[in-house]
């Protein structure tokens, strides 16, 4: 790649810091297995005067989802599950599923299946109030969860929480439309039931330890907290201040292992660790001499597997031109999105972290920050535009 063109990224990243868009961040680009751009900018924690570094620990939030997808496909590779399996076979809370409709609550047309969870087409909701009755009831469940957590009496376990989720009527019939929701959390519970291990233990045994992802977990041990980045939120005045609240079932501020290990949002990691995970996917399930997934399993989750009808609601600005695979977007119409190559896949997180793999060009792009809600799609798109301009003919 043209290193002179890549150097343009220095100015762009520093501008994000200087303008107050982010307190700090890390941008890494890997081409053909080599780090062709790898620089840190600004502060991981302003109050502690902690600079962003290679070993800064970040909250992944929804970049946890691809990890849970891989865990699910490990079970698939071993013949322990089939993607057409009913979720109720593993989680009894999903038996006799009901659906909220304009005419009231009715029985589901069919059972929720594992493939519905992988593709976010199960009809589930996140805890969103004033959207629909299902979202309100999911929010009630999470409120109850927080009450238990903050009372000091412990919370629901992963399996217990997901069984409670299954008792809430769906907002739509299973398999009919895409909707971002707790699907990955439920997959995490299925991993626990099938493997007979806690989700964190399964991930450590089957993914993190084999890949050498030693700083990835559902909490940050005391001896590593001096590397843990602060999380910031933008106020009405546009300025960033530390954020002291948590959502999506995250509690304890990562100081101890949670009872509910959240497959959709709970992990922390470093750029170094997540690079190994991303490269494993890009290499068809293998990193170095270590195989985590079959190439077939990687192909399945990294390609579009939702129908045109389901995709009508997959309409976020950041997903224009993309289809959806196993808890990841996948680029199917690059002429619409204007940046990227057909077959690119990846995902992002609530605090602005983002990764994508481009198999056509053997590229991995990683952008890590800690700002609630991220900083929009334009900064990411312009960074990627410069990356692609640096590709040699």
Question: In which residue ranges do the predicted regions lie?
Answer:
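A generic structural motif
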Residues: 42-44, 247, 371
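Short, conserved catalytic-motif segment at the N-terminal edge
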Residues: 2-60, 80, 96-104, 377, ...
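Acidic helix-start/capping segments at beta-turn-to-alpha-helix junctions
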Residues: 88-95
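Short, surface-exposed loop or secondary-structure junction motifs
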Residues: 98-339
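Short glycine-rich, acidic/polar surface loops and turns
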Residues: 327, 342, 347-357
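Active-site SXXK
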Residues: 7-13, 33, 59-87, 184-192, ...
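Short, well-ordered beta-strand elements
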Residues: 36, 355-356, 362-371
């Amino acid at each position: 790649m043209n290193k002179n063109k890549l150097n343009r990224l220095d100015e762009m990243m520093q501008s994000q810091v200087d303008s107050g868009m982010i307190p700090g961040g890390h941008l890494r680009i890997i081409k053909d297995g080599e780090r062709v751009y790898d620089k840190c900018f600004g502060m991981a924690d302003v109050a502690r005067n902690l600079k962003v570094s290679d070993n800064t620990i970040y909250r992944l939030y929804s970049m946890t989802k691809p990890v849970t997808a891989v865990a699910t496909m490990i079970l698939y590779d071993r013949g322990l599950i089939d993607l057409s399996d009913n979720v109720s076979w593993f989680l009894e809370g999903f038996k006799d599923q009901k659906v909220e409709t304009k005419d009231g609550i009715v029985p589901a047309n069919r059972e929720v299946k594992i493939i519905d969870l992988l593709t976010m087409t199960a009809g589930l909701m996140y805890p969103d109030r004033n959207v629909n009755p299902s979202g309100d009831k999911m929010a009630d469940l999470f409120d109850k969860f927080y009450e238990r957590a903050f009372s000091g009496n412990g919370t629901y376990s992963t399996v217990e929480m997901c069984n409670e989720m299954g008792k809430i009527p769906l907002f739509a019939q299973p398999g009919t439309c895409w909707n971002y929701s707790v699907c990955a959390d439920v997959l995490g519970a299925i991993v626990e039931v099938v493997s007979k291990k806690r989700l964190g233990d399964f991930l450590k045994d089957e993914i993190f330890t084999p890949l050498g992802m030693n700083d990835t977990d559902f909490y940050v041990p005391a001896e590593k907290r001096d590397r843990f980045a602060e999380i910031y939120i933008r106020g009405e005045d546009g300025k960033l201040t530390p954020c002291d609240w948590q959502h999506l079932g995250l509690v304890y501020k990562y100081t101890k292992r949670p009872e509910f290990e959240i497959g959709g949002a709970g992990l922390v990691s470093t750029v170094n660790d997540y690079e190994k995970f991303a490269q494993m996917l890009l290499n068809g399930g293998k990193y170095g001499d270590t195989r985590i997934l079959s190439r077939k399993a990687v192909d399945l989750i990294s390609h579009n597997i939702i129908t045109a009808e389901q995709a009508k609601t997959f309409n976020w600005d950041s997903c224009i031109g993309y289809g959806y695979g196993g808890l990841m977007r996948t680029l199917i119409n690059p002429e619409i999105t204007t940046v990227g190559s057909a077959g690119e896949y990846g995902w992002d997180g609530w605090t602005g972290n983002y990764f994508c793999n481009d198999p056509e060009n053997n590229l991995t792009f990683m952008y890590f920050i800690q700002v609630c809600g991220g900083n929009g799609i334009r900064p990411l798109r312009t960074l990627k535009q410069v990356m692609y301009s640096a590709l040699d003919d």
